[in-house]
Each structure stands twice: as structure tokens, then as C-alpha cells.
Amino acid sequence: MNPWTVVIHAQAEAELLSLPPDMRARFLRIAEMLEEFGPGRIGLPLVRPLTNKLWEMRMQGRDGIARAVYVAVQDRRLLVLHVFIKKTQRTPSNAISTALKRWSGVQ
């Protein structure tokens, strides 16, 4: 069976690079786990479903909480659409709409 691959949208890559180093390291670790084991074998507290086909990677660091919204696409690829620092309890609706816009632009 082919392994999974995590692909980062160009705008999400810029957002990822703006995160503090400890959160970037957590993102890389979760991405490695998703590639190695597949999305079906990784769950809370590292990833959780959002809406439709969107999922979020959950990263916590010294400076707060960050999330990376991703979707599974063809050929066993996970496409990271949006990365942001979370400031409230709920995932902001504008973060979800940003991810959906980027996803529709890729399709």
C-alpha cells in the first residue's frame, strides 16, 4: 500500500513558517505520524474532524495553541490548507472558510 504524503498549500506554508519554532516542530511531528500511520490511525489529541472533509492538526506550545486545517485528497495525499494561532475555545469560522476557499481553488 502506498504511504500517505502531507502536502502544504503555498499560503499555508508561509503561515506555518510564521509560527514559533516549538509549534513548527509539533506540526512536523504530527505530519510525520500522519504519513507513517495514515489519518485513520491518528486521533485526539493530535487531530480531530472539523466539518465536511476538513480535519485539524492540534499543536500546543509555550506561546499558545495553533491549528493546521487539512483535507484528504486523491492519491493518499493530505493537503494542509490553513495554519493559524488559535485565540478562542472554538475554531474560528473564518479559518474554516479560508481553508474551504483554498481547497476549492486547488480542485
Residue ranges and their predicted role:
Residues 1-65, 74-77, 85-107:
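Basic, Lys/Arg-enriched alpha-helical interface segments
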Residues 68-70:
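Hydrophobic/aromatic beta-strand elements that line small-molecule binding cavities or substrate pockets
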Residues 81:
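ATP-dependent carboxylate-activation loops
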